[in-house]
Structure formats: C-alpha cells, structure tokens
Amino acid sequence: MNEKSLRVLEFNKIKDELKKYTQTSAAKDLIERLHPYESAYEVREHLMETEEAFKISIKKGDAPFSGLYDIREAISKAQRRFTLFPSELLRVANLLRASRRFKGYVKSDDLSEKYEVLESITEGLVPLNGLEEEISKCIIGEEEISDRASTTLFNIRRSLKDKTSSIKARVNSLIRTYSSHLQENIYTVRGERYVLPVKVEHKGAVPGLVHDQSASGATLFIEPMSLVDLNNEIKELRLKEKAEIDRILAFLSGKVYENVDVIKVDADILWELDFIFAKAKYAQKLGAIMPIISEDGHFNIINAKHPLIDPKKVVENNIYLRDGITSVVITGPNTGGKTVTLKTVGLLHIMAMSGLMITASQGSTISFFKEVFADIGDEQSIEQSLSTFSSHMTNIVNIIDSADENSLVLFDELGAGTDPTEGAALAVSILENLRKRKTKVIATTHYSELKAYALKVDNVENASVEFDVETLRPTYRLLIGVPGKSNAFEISKRLGLPDYIIEDAREGISEETLKFEDLIQSLQHKNIKAQEHARKAESAKEEAVKLKEKYESKLDKFQDIREKAILNAQKEAKEIIKEAKEEADKILKDIRELERMGYSSDVRKLLEENRKKLKDKLEKTESKLNQPKEVGEAVTNVSEGDELYLPKFETKVMVLTNPDNKGDVQVQAGIMKIKVNIKDLRKTKETKIEKRQRKKKQMSLNLKSVATSVDLRGMDSEEATYTADKYLDDACMSGLSEVTIIHGKGTGVLRTAINDMLKRHPHVKSYRLGNYGEGGNGVTVVELK
C-alpha cells in the first residue's frame, strides 16, 4: 500500500489512538509497523482475532496483562549471562504469570463459542511455573529481596535486627550520658555507622572517631569508642547480606538464562496478544463492528462514520458501490461533507484491511483492494513552485500509471484549479479511462459535465450531498443515485438579492437546463422522504427485535429454572423409589423362600407379616414423594454472626452484616458472598454442641490449609481486592491473628485499593506497611480481630 495514501487518509492518527490501549512498548512497535495486509485471507484472519478478543473481553473482562512490561532488554542481558536487577527479574515473573493465566483466559468451556484464532496463538505459550514461583518467592519489590529467599539471608537479617536493637539501646544510653555535650539529644547515621552530634567545643568529652562535620562547623559527628565494635559487626553483616543477595540474583538470572528461549517465545506471543487486545479495546471505544470482506470490488458500508470525528458531531452515511457500478460522482456545495465522505470510505477500507474493526453498522461489507489511491487536499510543494492544478495532476499521473481493477481511487475536486471547460473535459477523460480498466472510483466535483457523464454512461452513478435551502446549511447526508443540484438562485433569493436580478439570470440559462435542475430537486425531495421513512421503519424494526430478544431471554431463563426444578425432583424421587424397590426385592425374596418351604401356620403368619411390611413401605414411599420439603422456621431477628439456612440454595449460611432498612443482609455461602432478604432465611436445627464441634473441625481443617500470606502481584485492582477479601475471611475462620498481603511497590495503585478495602473490612483490627525485611512498602501486615 502506498505511503502517500496512508498519510492523506490519516491512518497514522488511527495508529496513534490504537497505541493508547497497549500495555507494552513492544506492542506499540508492532502498531507502528501496521499496514494493510496483502491478501483477503490475511485480512479475514486478523479481523477474526480482533473480533475474538472483542468478544472474550466483554464476556470475561480485561485480559490478564496486569504487570506486563517490555522485557527485551532483560532478555538480551540474560542471553549474555549478565546478572539481572530485581526489577527485571520481577518483570520476567510477571510475564510468566501472564503466560500461565492467558492459556486459561482464552479457553472456552462453551462448545458453541470457541476462540479458535486466539487458542491457536496461545498454544505456543509455555508457562514456567517453577521459575515464576521461585522469583516471586525471592523478590517482593523492585528493589527488595524477601527474607524467604534463602535460609542464609534470613539468618543474616535476624542477626542484623538483633545487633541493630543492641546498638540502638547502647547509643540511647550514651545520649543520656553525654547529653550536655550534644547539640541535640539524638543519634544519627554517617556512612552506615551510628554517631552522636557533639558540640565542637566539647569534642574531647566524647572519646571516639570523627566521621563528619556540619556545614556550619559547630557540630562534629563522632562515633563513640564503645560503639565501634557493634558498628563493625553491623557493617560486616550488611556486607554478608549484600553478598547473599548478589548470589540469589545471580542464581535466578542463571535460571532465566537456562530458559531464555522459552521466555523469548512467550514474550513475543504476549506482545502480539497485547497488540490484538488493543485493537479490541479501541473497537469497543469506537463502537466498531466486524465487517464482511468481499473480493469483487463492491462494498456497502451501513451508517459509516469517520472514526476521528467527534462522535457527538459526526453524521452517519450509507456509502456503497453496488454491483455493476465502477464509479460514483459526488456533487454538492463546498463544506458539504464531500471530502469527509471520501476520507471515510478510504480510511475504513484501510482499517479493515489492517485487521481493525470499523465504525459502521452490522452487516457492512468492505472490499479487499490491492491498492487505495487518494488525491485529496492540496499537497503542493512550495519548493517545487507547483500550482494547485499541477500538484493534483502530478498525483493523478502516478495514479493512472498504477491503478487497475483491484484498486480503489479517491479523487477530490477532479479537474479543479484550471479553466472550467478544459478541467471538466480532462475529468471526464480520466474517469472514462479508469472505467475501461474497471478501476473502482469515487470522485467529487463541481462540474455539471460530470453529472451529465454519469447519467449517460453505464457503470457510473451520480451522488450528492444534501443542502437545506431553508437554513442555508449542508446536512452532510450523502444521497447516492441523485445528482447534486445548484442552489445558487435559492440561496441568493434568501439572502436578499432582488427578484428581477434572479429572473434575468434565469433567462440566461436554457430551458432544458432549468428543467434538468428542477428534476434533480424533485428527485432529492423524494429521496429525502424515502430515507426518512426507511429510518423510521428501521428504528421500529430494531425496537421489535430488542423486545423479541428480551422476552425470548426471559422465556429461556424460566425454562432453565423449570427444567432444573423438574430434574432435581426426578432425581430425589428416583432415590426414594430405589430405596423402596430394594426393600421390596428383599421382602419378595423372603416370600419366595417361604413358599419353597411350604405353608405351615407359622410360615403363613410370617408371610402375612412380610406382605403387610411391603404394603406399609410402599405407602410410606408414596407419602414421602408427595410430602413438601421442610424449609425450617422463619426468622424475625437477625444479627451479624448468626448461622441460618437459605432454602433456595439448600445450604447453611453465615450472616456477615446486620439488616439494613429494607431487611437485606450479606451472607457467606461457601466461597460466595451474596445479599438476601431476611424473609428468605430459616432457622437451622443444629444443636449448639454440634455447632461447636463442626466449627472446631472446620477451624482445624482451615488451619492446615490457609497460608499466612497472599501474593496479589500481577493482578488488577478488582481481582486483587476480591482475592484479598476472600483470603481474610479464610484466615479469620482459621484463627490466624496476623497475615501479610503482598502487593508490590509499583505505582501504588494496588496498595491504595487494598488499603481502601482494609479500612472497612469487618475482620481487620489494624494494618501497617511492612518493616525492612518484611517487604517494606511492598507488603501490608494485617492484624485480625
């Protein structure tokens, strides 16, 4: 595709908008290289991937790109066996996490709705769960290594903590001893060593090593001799800590090196997916649709809108090139929307052929073209001193040299900028030449000669942009099949030009021309009325379809509920009948045995007893089938912590909140939290002893399974909040008193969301950011009630 047309049609602006929806700079690079594809097959394939991403993101929410970065530099370093920074390793882990999650994200359990293209792409993803877990365990922030990274690091940091506590106690004691010699009763740190701020005139009173002096010279920062050994020990521990961290980073970097080929493939696939889902997000923002792709050179774009014009201001138009037509000639006033129409046709074709959905209505058809040529606007070169006409003609010469039956050509004001007679003749000749080649052409013009040409010649159709004579404003509506009419007399009259001047002007025009213009005006009015009726009919049809879909949905839902109820009832009945049948078989077996033995009086008596037993059992079975299901006693007062029964789900629930003014409460049903009205709840028959035993057993089970921390890194705010909320419930039920939520440092968005949730969580007593060694700002430590 020629670059000039892409530039003139402003495809670069579309790509700039598309980049806003990517997560990585690698995906932005893919967008920068985006061009129309070279075959209709490729176009359909890439449109299908966009449509699948569009559908899956609506059904399942945003794709799992959270925490994904461009790691090309980290991959390059790993290939050269360099040690990676913690931030780089963390991003590698995030990429591996995204790989793992994406495979599940695109997998559909619904056989009727498969995401074949996306599933094919994600088949190449190879999650490295072990490496992901190893990095996540060791690195808890872009600059912080976890105490859990190794036993050695844990022991070093524990010793550091002990030594730091000792030196702080010692230095506080020295502050009290030397308080009269200090500028302030505080300690400070210079070169990672604890020192005291001693007045310069009292330096002899505090024996020790001078490390620094204040800017004013009034204070010396002295390390007392009694702190030297402790400071040395702390310094030594910090060096050991650094050495151990370097070893851990080198070890993890080595693991990345061992798997670098797999990681590189995963990264390439994820960046491609980032690009694909950016196309889907942009389509959602535009309200775009998946077009049908034809290869016959004809198209029908329904309610086409220019994607770069404000949606509140843009005018929709039906733009089509029907079967048997190769060229459309559009006439109408300046600023009437002719140029926008040309750009809309060209840009929507470029977008579709680049795998992007288009701003139009469902059912729209786009044709695949090998080339789209556009001579729009005045791109003359001042340096070349080209006139408007020369500039356009230079461009037209290039188009004539290259265009064929697989090309779409867009001409704006064909033949303008020179003598009208010669310009019109040239325009007709150019159109005729391209018509003979079967090149598809849309051209705008002011020349009446081109209107006449379109009326006389096969395969060429007239069109016009509508003009409202009452308001003297263009409506920007395109009328295909109707040539444009000159409105000079009507406009002049409404602006106040005397009638006698207008009449004199009319006399200068042939009667045939006037009749032709009147015919055009009549056609325009009829076309406008027909389109208005069509719009109303379409609106009524859409409303009817929506109502039909609404009630069909309700009917389907009712049918599902009914079938489920019948299925449950049948299942229960079968169980009861099965029990009765087993009992009956046993009795009949006994009867046959008795008959074989003969009929003594004792035997006959036993036989009658067994027959009566069978009869009673069957009567009980029938009674059980007809007996309504017991749902328990209704409740009137409900409090937080009550355990009740929810009949509609046939499960016990725990009440989490007191009733609001409508009687609604939040309850926990298994892993679900739902809101119900107290009238839907029933008392349980469970005794207090059973309840205590069950709770004790449940707590025992939970204590075995609930960890003391939860890792939320790589999740978005919504997923992280839900996961943390559920985790806190489980931790509380397990009897844990303190837990750690790992959210990472990053931009702070995740930490803020978690803090907002913790403020109002019923199980939270207090919370704080982690201390050094716990994870710092990358974790939040929560104390539970």
Curated annotation (Swiss-Prot):
Keywords: ATP-binding, DNA-binding, Endonuclease, Hydrolase, Nuclease, Nucleotide-binding, RNA-binding, rRNA-binding. GO terms for molecular function: ATP binding; ATP hydrolysis activity; ATP-dependent DNA damage sensor activity; endonuclease activity; mismatched DNA binding; ribosomal large subunit binding; rRNA binding. Its EC number is 3.1.-.-, 3.6.4.-. It is an enzyme of class 3 (hydrolase). Pfam families: MSSS, MutS_V, Smr. Residues 710-785 form the Smr domain. CDD domains: ABC_MutS2 (cd03280), ATP-synt_Fo_b (cd06503). PROSITE patterns: DNA_MISMATCH_REPAIR_2, SMR. ATP binds at G332, P333, N334, T335, G336, G337, K338, T339. GO terms for biological process: mismatch repair; negative regulation of DNA recombination; rescue of stalled ribosome. InterPro entries: DNA_mismatch_repair_MutS_C, DNA_mismatch_repair_MutS_core, DNA_mismatch_repair_MutS_sf, MSSS, MutS, MutS2, P-loop_NTPase, Smr_dom. Signal peptide: none annotated. HAMAP family: MutS2. Endonuclease that is involved in the suppression of homologous recombination and thus may have a key role in the control of bacterial genetic diversity. Acts as a ribosome collision sensor, splitting the ribosome into its 2 subunits. Detects stalled/collided 70S ribosomes which it binds and splits by an ATP-hydrolysis driven conformational change. Acts upstream of the ribosome quality control system (RQC), a ribosome-associated complex that mediates the extraction of incompletely synthesized nascent chains from stalled ribosomes and their subsequent degradation. Probably generates substrates for RQC. Homodimer. Binds to stalled ribosomes, contacting rRNA. Belongs to the DNA mismatch repair MutS family. MutS2 subfamily. This is Endonuclease MutS2. It comes from Clostridium novyi (strain NT).
